[in-house]
Amino acid sequence: MSGNGNAAAIAEEDTPKMRVIRVGTRKSQLARIQTDSVVATLKALYPGLQFEIIAMSTTGDKILDTALSKIGEKSLFTKELEHALERNEVDLVVHSLKDLPTVLPPGFTIGAVCKRESPYDAVVFHPKFVGKTLETLPEKSVVGTSSLRRAAQLQRKFPHLEFKSIRGNLNTRLRKLDELQEFSAIILATAGLQRMGWQNRVGQILHPEECMYAVGQGALGVEVRAKDQDILDLVGVLHDPETLLRCIAERSFLRHLEGGCSVPVAVHTAIKDGQLYLTGGVWSLNGAETMQDTMQTTIHVPVQHEDGPEDDPQLVGITARNIPRQPQLAAENLGISLATLLLNKGAKNILDVARQLNEAH
């Protein structure tokens, strides 16, 4: 059985006792809000199913005194959740897509890429600097960010500022900003602030010419067991075609560059007039060196889902059998082409030096 037939079968089975779908999530407030939103959508689609949310801490949640890029481990926010999937303790896991590596461990796949919210970064200012911008902050002001990508781009753009690592969940980082006198501002993902209902704290949105965003930023990904056809069918309806195609291009670019948390890589994508545009860049740690370019490809964004073959291999960790294959392959090839272009221009040297310097500090 293909398509939503399996999902319908799940919804009908076990009556009168309803089948319970167990959903894994990180414990942070933002992770819970994100998971609740996905579960609410699934409940509306499948009123015959019950959902149980199981929250757990991950390595990235526990190690709070070290910059993410220094911990030296991929899957910082996903490993414990994947163990639960593997042991059949949960049926699906909701993540921020940017936390999911472009190569997933064997046996797992991203079964849904949900509609993207704002992918841009935002600046939140200390109360005494409200009304300022990064440009107008005093000389030597300290700006907190946990991301090499943000720090590299912003040091290049705003050399009068100093950038320092700040860790913790959103609540913790905002508290550190407001209560300590250490930071004049911090950089956070706009989507996270919006989901928490903290739009009023956004003092400045950073547009691509100031700071391109992380691969997958603003989108949620639903990770499942790769061979669990029932659950794949269940969550597949959550795929947002435009978000999916943009994120396949972004993840393909990152994967082909062999980038990750330990190097500054950023992107910007857009679909306009039947064209998918991908801008990607790499930076040295201090932002002094950079290499960027833009490419485009013709793409057809499907209006509705359709059933596809069950044996199609994953693309950059994503399974989307209900979205036509051709545009997915076009998006993947665009990412590969742009990465190849930058590598041929010498991007590997910038990334290698950034990686070595990051590991040495």
From Swiss-Prot:
Catalytic activity of the protein: 4 porphobilinogen + H2O = hydroxymethylbilane + 4 NH4(+)
One annotated GO molecular function: hydroxymethylbilane synthase activity
Sites bearing Phosphoserine, chain numbering: S69, S147
Keywords: Acetylation, Cytoplasm, Heme biosynthesis, Phosphoprotein, Porphyrin biosynthesis, Transferase
CC cofactor: dipyrromethane
Modified residues (N-acetylserine): S2
GO cellular component annotations of the record: cytoplasm; cytosol
GO biological process, alphabetically ordered: heme A biosynthetic process; heme B biosynthetic process; heme biosynthetic process; heme O biosynthetic process; protoporphyrinogen IX biosynthetic process
Biological function: As part of the heme biosynthetic pathway, catalyzes the sequential polymerization of four molecules of porphobilinogen to form hydroxymethylbilane, also known as preuroporphyrinogen. Catalysis begins with the assembly of the dipyrromethane cofactor by the apoenzyme from two molecules of porphobilinogen or from preuroporphyrinogen. The covalently linked cofactor acts as a primer, around which the tetrapyrrole product is assembled. In the last step of catalysis, the product, preuroporphyrinogen, is released, leaving the cofactor bound to the holodeaminase intact.
NCBIfam families reported in the protein's UniProt record: hemC
The protein, known as: Porphobilinogen deaminase
Species whose genome carries this gene: Bos taurus
Gene (name only): HMBS
